[in-house]
Swiss-Prot record:
It is found in: Cytoplasm. S-adenosyl-L-methionine binds at G113, I133, G134, D135, F136, V137, M138. This is tRNA (guanine-N(1)-)-methyltransferase. Specifically methylates guanosine-37 in various tRNAs. The lineage of its organism: Bacteria, Pseudomonadati, Pseudomonadota, Gammaproteobacteria, Vibrionales. GO terms for cellular component: cytosol. InterPro entries: Alpha/beta_knot_MTases (IPR029028), tRNA_m1G_MeTrfase_C_sf (IPR023148), tRNA_m1G_MeTrfase_TrmD (IPR002649), tRNA_m1G_MTases_N (IPR029026), tRNA_MeTrfase_TRMD/TRM10 (IPR016009). SUPFAM superfamilies: alpha/beta knot.
């Protein structure tokens, strides 16, 4: 996967290109991340990248010319058809379904806004989609862009050692993840559930699914409203709820 980034602070993306799973993916050639700084496309000695908005008001907007030239340069460098994304509070909220949709693209170009945003005409002429990571305001689009890169790259073949990790993580099937345990068997008097040490893979799968359903019911019940549960899932959720009520008595 190729990802281009338009940012006034390209150095921030070293945390993605140099570290962790994404850093390893870059080293292996599975993920390519290139950055373009609008300051490099300015024509004045001050390298100005902001401008006053028409109509007045607080704050500044990103200057059109440097931003547009940076976008065009990035598009020309892209290895193929590219989806252009503007990280914006007005965009579609990123969720697991959105991540998987974006992961089907071989090339993405991410535009990181600053100040009060960008000229609406740039969005209309250059941007394919707007995406948001939540209903809150940040100082720029860099961290949302890094969030998108990290989540999408997990679905690039070979990035994760075990692709099942991506398929079984929280939200991958619309549910929260089940609890996980490692050594020691007893920690502060709390034991690992016996079923996980039984070696019975059928029962382990059943336990994990029940815990996943139960945790979703407890913490994010609204997620269940959008799911069509199978007969097995409905039975396991009912068992979990009954067991939970029994423990409270």
């Amino acid at each position: 996967m190729w990802v281009g980034v338009i940012s006034l602070f390209p150095e921030m993306f070293r945390s993605v290109t140099d570290f962790g799973v994404t850093g390893q993916a870059v080293k292996k050639g599975l993920l390519s991340i290139e950055t373009w700084n609008p300051r490099d496309f300015t024509h004045d000695k001050h390298r100005t990248v902001d401008d006053r908005p028409y109509g007045g008001g607080p704050g500044m907007l990103m200057m059109v010319q440097p931003l547009r030239d940076a976008i065009h340069a990035a598009k020309q460098a892209s290895p193929g058809k590219t989806k252009v994304i503007y990280l914006s509070p007005q965009g579609r909220k990123l969720d697991q379904q959105g991540v998987e949709e974006l992961a089907t693209n071989e090339n993405l170009l991410l535009i990181c806004g600053r100040y009060e945003g960008v000229d609406e005409r740039i969005i209309q002429s250059e941007v394919d989609e707007e995406w948001s990571i939540g209903d809150f305001v940040m100082t720029g689009g860099e961290i949302p862009a890094m969030t998108l890169i990290d989540s999408v790259s997990r679905f690039v073949p070979g990035v994760l050692g075990d692709f099942a990790s991506a398929e079984e993580d929280s939200f991958a099937n619309g549910l929260l993840d089940c609890p996980h345990y490692t050594r020691p068997e007893v920690l502060d008097g709390k034991e690992v559930p016996e079923v996980l040490m039984s070696g019975n893979h059928k029962e382990i799968r059943r336990w994990r699914l029940k815990q996943s359903l139960g945790r979703t019911w407890q913490r994010r019940p609204e997620l269940l409203e959008n799911l069509a549960l199978t007969d097995e899932q409905e039975q396991l959720l009912a068992e979990f709820i009954q067991e939970t009520h029994h423990k409270r008595k």
